């Protein structure tokens, strides 16, 4: 695959990315291998919704997964990364229903079967968008194994699990309080409800005693549920209301008398110590109702409208009903007070409609016994969670978990495999469609119309994608999977449920490690949203800066437990880093392009090499060691930092400069040493960097000399202990300190880079002084010195600038090079000009009339000018301070 052509002057990322995506996929470079005697590494992708398009969270998540997969593949492990998408029941149905609405139709106009066909057609036409975008960011999945949660194989798994759990008594059907979305018209699980802070009202309402002897004030945020009140609850020890058990309380606006129940759930010191109990529309009230055998009176229907039980309010929208009831309470003297009240209101996670707690006949999973196994697995260390700060949150949630409502009143999804017999009422739950009732023989069977919660099929993802319930070779080789990488916000939606299902059905954990990454926010730490205009589109970023730049940026920001504040300026900065690598490789190619493998022999005996080569090999060995350690500890940002610091600071800024004279030398031994080390170090860099930036590294690798396969499938470097050389590192660090000192003096004194200068080093340690002297030539070349001396003592000239490195003093005479007084005078004049402009602008910005009357864009422009002038003033002052130090 090696080419003879020299790398182009500039890195044209669009062409390179297209080329390697095509070649990798054409040659099936990422196919799963199951070779005997090798370690296995497997990941299942968190399946994005089939309705989705790539957002920056997807880009982060899949970049981190890809880094691990590429690393383990290069380490020689049997590696499998299964891609796929989720059918996303509610979301997908909503998309297709909106499409139908543009045609003036609803799903009921089509009927269930035709509607489902329409959804499949939509999936065929549009569902591949997110998959193609995941490929575009370089995800090295085994794309031949792509799965969909409604695939035939996965549907078989879902049915099998449902039937098993039902027959074990872990799935049941019951009339319970659920979260209901009036827009989607379906039940939602607890963790599908998003609670948002809301500025509401608290209504204080007088409930009269039935005998007219008094009343009690009860506060509620939801007066529209009053027609559904079936009791008043007080604490058993509250003597104020002890007598009411025999009397009862009148429900305002009606003639109904409500019983008083005594329940320990009531806090007698909170408010008046009395609660209205509406079992059909509040979870806590429902529990009270069950304990006391209260009637269920449902007053709000599936569309969020008041039903016939609401009396004269029937037909009103629930929020309109609230207004009407409050007005009626006021008119009839029952309304005592309305106060502002901040509280959390539940919303549907899909359509954002305010949810309605209501009683409904639904299917549930009894999760307590399943959750206990998952908690034990985490406590025992069978599953590790990264970062560790999530352990307590996990335990707390699992300890307080409630049964999972798994039925959804929609059409798109896995239809529940349960049938009812019309003749005898028998409920039949089987993996295969029954033809007759096993109890009475009737053929009049009707299947449950509800479908399963999308998260039910997703909870089986780690093993259903590998062919369960069949005992496949994939399951034998790759289950449990190695690690799950996902966002922390679906720890309970998905991660915990996979633990429960995996442990119960497979008797093994579904993954050994869980890495929870943070959400990606804008540079100010604010949540990205279209309404605020701060969304960073990864596809636009890739088009502007290149995919590798985006991947490297996301990796650099992915510190465990830390919020990711994405700044486009940093993406641009890392694009410069990619260009730096390209230019360094191009320089190297000019010198090693005609080499063969024999040139590498130099690195086999590093002790015989010159200092610069021994130093870079030692640093390379430590780079590789650090990369292995960081990747196995999921310290992704450290992997980026190690590569960045080594490549930019050590390899490019120091090593390439240090060996230039050898590369152009007539001394063939010195030249071959330099070329051999350069090739080996460059190859190592490409390998350590490849998991993060696959495109640029694969392109550079392909043009290096020799026969080469894909870099993506080459061997990851091992730590070369024989390369480690503490003495070489100490000596090189000393020389780098001297060179840095001389360069700093030149920079601060603003001496032109081409101007030759003299430098003197005062070093009292004779051993270090000898080392410095022995590299006079190298130091002089890298700092453009005319004269260089190393002494134990010397008198510093009056016009010399000084730099202290540890206990070593460096000075450079500046006579004839810099007129400090003239430079200071010039800076002083420039400062006065800037101050005058700044005074004008500050006057404008301090003028209330200007701020109130000028267009927002004009104010923003003036503010920007002020910031630029402030920055310019700071630079002038910095330059003045530097010169004063030299004077």
Swiss-Prot record:
Pfam family, one: Val_tRNA-synt_C
Catalytic EC class: ligase
Gene3D superfamilies: HUPs (3.40.50.620), Isoleucyl-tRNA Synthetase, Domain 1 (1.10.730.10), Valyl-tRNA synthetase, C-terminal domain (1.10.287.380), Valyl/Leucyl/Isoleucyl-tRNA synthetase, editing domain (3.90.740.10)
Main location: cytoplasm
Recorded GO CC terms: cytosol
Binding site for ATP: 530
Motif ('HIGH' region): 48-58
Coiled coil: 814-887
Protein EC: 6.1.1.9
NCBIfam families registered for this protein in UniProt: PRK05729.1, valS
Family per similarity comment: Belongs to the class-I aminoacyl-tRNA synthetase family. ValS type 1 subfamily.
Name of this protein: Valine--tRNA ligase
Gene: valS
